[in-house]
Amino acid sequence: MHVKKGDKVKVITGKDKGKSGKVLAAFPKKDRVLIEGINMVKKHTKPSNINPQGGILNVEAPIHVSNVMLIDPKTGEPTRVGYEVKGDKKVRVAKKSGEVIDK
């Protein structure tokens, strides 16, 4: 998967197209990511000990990883991600600027 937790990404398709946010969680087996403030859905909860009131909550839902692009740390524009072997480590590289993403 080309994005990891903590990356800044931009949504390129769907109802939140054009918005950007930070990746809160990545689910590689399902090819989905959870992005801060993106793909908000209403979740209905029953009253419980933790939430005695119950009600409707707004929570983020996962979005497919193909619908997001990583934001280039150098230019601030969305970019595709490539991989290079530097020394004995495989690092992610921004295709637009050639900037190494993994530090």
Swiss-Prot record:
InterPro entries to which the protein is assigned, alphabetical: KOW, Rib_uL2_dom2, Ribosomal_uL24, Ribosomal_uL24_CS, Ribosomal_uL24_KOW, Translation_prot_SH3-like_sf
Keywords recorded for this protein, A-Z: Ribonucleoprotein, Ribosomal protein, RNA-binding, rRNA-binding
A Pfam cross-reference name: KOW
Matching Gene3D superfamilies: 2.30.30.30
Superkingdom of source: Bacteria
CC annotations in GO: ribonucleoprotein complex; ribosome
Biological process annotations from GO: translation
Example GO molecular function: rRNA binding
PROSITE patterns: RIBOSOMAL_L24 (PS01108)
Keyword NADP: no
Function description: One of two assembly initiator proteins, it binds directly to the 5'-end of the 23S rRNA, where it nucleates assembly of the 50S subunit.
HAMAP family, per the entry: Ribosomal_uL24_B
Family: Belongs to the universal ribosomal protein uL24 family.
Subunit annotation: Part of the 50S ribosomal subunit.
Protein name: Large ribosomal subunit protein uL24
Organism expressing this protein natively: Listeria welshimeri serovar 6b (strain ATCC 35897 / DSM 20650 / CCUG 15529 / CIP 8149 / NCTC 11857 / SLCC 5334 / V8)
